[in-house]
Regions:
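Conserved beta-strand-loop surface patch within small alpha/beta domains used
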Residues: 1-71, 79-126
Length: 126
């Protein structure tokens, strides 16, 4: 698997703004994209149906999602500011990658991306 994730700056701004608006609750969105030679390229952000946003958690019923092989991962927020995935994050992640954004949601410095094993990947914002 690639160790690099490529994300347009507009998409990162959208994820950060959504997290900021829901703060102090956690936000969650799906990441659509594709695996390419140079890395995993995220092309779109989707709001999962029937998502729940709470203090210390966010979730959605996976069985309510249509079959979509373009989902490469999930992005969610940590209102605490921590950018490290919890055991729960790793166990409940969907797809190949997990993007975590943390308070104060100001920019790339408040975002980290991981694979399903919790290993840090390179986040390239273009």
């Amino acid at each position: 698997m690639s160790s690099r994730v490529i994300l347009k700056s507009e998409l990162l701004e959208m994820i950060l703004e959504g997290a900021k608006r829901l703060h102090p609750k956690e936000s969650i969105v799906l990441l659509r994209g594709k695996v390419e030679k140079e890395g995993i390229r995220v092309s779109d952000v989707l709001i999962p149906p029937f998502a729940t946003y709470g203090r210390g958690f966010s979730s959605f019923p996976g069985h309510m999602l249509p079959m979509d092989f373009s989902i490469v991962g999930v992005a969610h927020s940590h209102p605490s500011g921590s950018l490290k995935p919890s055991v729960g994050d790793q166990n409940l992640s969907m797809g190949r990658i997990m993007l975590i954004v943390g308070f104060p949601y100001a920019g790339k410095e408040n975002a980290r991306v991981y694979n399903k094993q919790g290993e840090s990947l390179v986040l390239e914002v273009i």
